[in-house]
UniProtKB/Swiss-Prot annotation:
GO terms for molecular function: arylformamidase activity; formamidase activity; zinc ion binding. Belongs to the Cyclase 1 superfamily. KynB family. Pathway: Amino-acid degradation; L-tryptophan degradation via kynurenine pathway; L-kynurenine from L-tryptophan: step 2/2. It holds the Pfam family Cyclase. The gene is kynB. The lineage of its organism: Bacteria, Pseudomonadati, Rhodothermota, Rhodothermia, Rhodothermales. InterPro entries: KFase/CYL, KFase_sf, Kynurenine_formamidase_bac. It comes from the Bacteria. Its EC number is 3.5.1.9. Transmembrane segments: none annotated. The active site is at H58 (proton donor/acceptor). Substrate binds at W17. Binds 2 zinc ions per subunit. It comes from Salinibacter ruber (strain DSM 13855 / M31). Keywords: Hydrolase, Metal-binding, Tryptophan catabolism, Zinc. This is Kynurenine formamidase.
Length: 212
């Protein structure tokens, strides 16, 4: 079964939140140079680089860290929802009727996703808190977006982040859904096991959902 890569590429050219740690890649050893028998690389980056999961610790001082997040939230049935290109935010009417297991994880495809990996967007399509509460009522365990944040980029009170925290929904940001049609899929998006982390990079993929 073919996999669809929905992850941002990570390189020194990858755009990051203004003021955040930029991606730094260096070779610490090169084969056949300096008597080394192997190539070794060193990578320095923000926990929020590219496609990543936010842990509750990101917005709550004593919140749950990435290594404590339940792994079953990151694997299983998912639905890609295509939000109107002109929509200023993701509202309850965009989610429609979510059915059964395919509603366990919802990924929003918005106009935010058109920015290339090396360009930070001027604005994003945020998710309204009432949308998040509607998703929680439908039994959703994970919400994903192709935006680098579920809130407006200039937000300081972070209402969507806190709504996700209050409802216990996992927050997956920075997806690449440009060429993914809306519909049912299986999501696999396991975060790095960073002890005490506020967030963690993810390699996220989709594959066609198995027949019900």
């Amino acid at each position: 079964m073919a996999l669809i890569d929905i992850s941002r590429s990570v390189s020194p050219a990858t755009a990051v939140w203004p003021g955040d740690q930029e991606v730094q890649w260096t070779w610490t050893a090169r084969r056949n140079e300096d008597e080394s028998s192997v190539n070794l690389g060193s990578l320095r980056l923000s926990t929020h680089t590219g496609t990543h999961v936010d842990a509750p610790l990101h917005v709550k001082r004593q919140g749950q860290a990435t290594d404590d997040l339940p792994l079953d939230s990151f694997v299983g049935p998912a639905r890609v929802v295509d939000v109107n290109a002109n929509a200023p935010s993701v509202r309850p009417e965009h989610i429609g009727q979510l059915d059964g297991a395919s509603a366990e994880r919802v990924l929003f495809k918005t106009s935010s996703g058109v920015s290339p990996d090396d360009e930070w967007p001027d604005a994003v399509v945020p998710i309204q808190p009432d949308t998040i509460h509607a998703l929680a009522d439908a039994g959703v365990s994970l919400v994903g977006t192709d935006a680098p944040s579920v809130d407006p980029l200039d937000s300081t009170d972070l209402p969507a982040h806190h709504a996700l925290l209050d409802t216990g929904i996992v927050n997956l940001e920075g997806l690449v859904l440009t060429n993914v049609p809306p519909g049912r899929y299986e999501l696999i998006a396991l975060p790095l096991k960073i002890v005490g982390g506020d967030a963690a990079p993810v390699r996220a993929v989709l594959r066609d959902a198995p027949d019900p």
